[in-house]
């Protein structure tokens, strides 16, 4: 298989384009400019709010004007990580992709399919005039990965749609009603420093080799957590 064989062709065409545009969280200026240029090229109404969220509107197919307006949403930032032996600047360098068996992968870095594939899907729909649809609004939010700040910054009236479909999911062909949710906790405590008694030793404790998983999609599986495991041993006294 080659990249040109990937289907749907329109989706992967735009995904490859997106991979050429650096888009770290909180540094989305280049991908915002790309989206604005896309909207202008296709003569679609495009606007950007104060946070950097982008909305591109596409009128309904003739005869579909009375359907409810649908909002398609994805986020334009990505998690930026690389292997230790890879030289890559996420602020300037494109993501290099390759086919590995049946998978499209990045060469030594994160791929950015979260949520680049959602962005590419929206762009493919906006660019394809053969798809019949009602009034359509495509929303591209910033800074999802480090706090959902783009989504939180949305103001009433920026969109007008009655239905919103978020395209940032894990499993193809499935629709979820609801979300995983999240909680932020701030814990504080006071402590008193004491001298280390004679005969005591310092130890460095590492917890590694765990299976890991997504805190939203895998939280219910009971897997080991490297933050919690060391704490569970603090009450023990070594012989």
Model-identified regions with their sequence ranges:
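Active-site metal-coordination/substrate-binding segment of hydrolases
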Residues: 64-146, 151-155, 161-162, 202
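Conserved active-site and cofactor/substrate-binding residues in soluble primary-metabolism enzymes
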Residues: 6-13, 26, 30, 34, ...
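Fold-level recognition of mixed alpha/beta catalytic cores in primary-metabolism enzymes, strongest
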Residues: 137-213, 217-222, 226
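Acidic/His- and Gly-rich active-site-bordering loop/insert found
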Residues: 2-102
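Conserved small/polar residues in nucleotide/adenosyl-binding loops
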Residues: 234-239
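Pocket-edge structural micro-motifs
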Residues: 58, 74, 99, 108, ...
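Flexible, glycine/proline-enriched loop segments at strand-loop-helix junctions
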Residues: 21, 25, 105-114, 174-175, ...
């Amino acid at each position: 298989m080659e990249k040109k064989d990937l289907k749907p062709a329109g989706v992967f065409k735009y995904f490859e384009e997106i991979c050429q545009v650096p888009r770290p969280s909180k540094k989305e200026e280049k991908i915002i400019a790309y989206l604005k240029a896309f909207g202008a090229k296709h003569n679609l109404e495009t606007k950007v709010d104060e946070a950097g969220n982008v909305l591109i509107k596409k009128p309904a197919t003739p005869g579909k004007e009375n359907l409810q307006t649908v909002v398609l949403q994805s986020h334009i930032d990505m998690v930026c990580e690389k292997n230790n032996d890879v030289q890559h600047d996420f602020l300037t360098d494109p993501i290099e992709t390759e086919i590995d068996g049946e998978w499209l992968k990045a060469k030594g870095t994160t791929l950015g399919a979260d949520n680049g594939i959602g962005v590419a899907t929206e762009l493919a729909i906006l660019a394809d005039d053969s798809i019949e649809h009602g009034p359509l609004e495509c929303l591209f939010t910033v800074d999802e990965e480090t706090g959902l700040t783009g989504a939180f910054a949305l103001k009433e009236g920026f969109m007008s749609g009655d239905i919103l479909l978020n395209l940032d999911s894990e499993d193809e062909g499935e629709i979820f009603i609801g979300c995983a949710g999240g909680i932020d906790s701030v814990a504080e405590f006071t402590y008193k420093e004491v001298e280390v008694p004679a005969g005591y030793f310092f130890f460095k404790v590492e917890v590694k080799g765990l299976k890991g998983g997504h805190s939203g999609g895998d939280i219910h599986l009971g897997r080991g957590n490297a933050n919690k495991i060391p704490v569970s041993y603090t009450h023990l006294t070594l012989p």
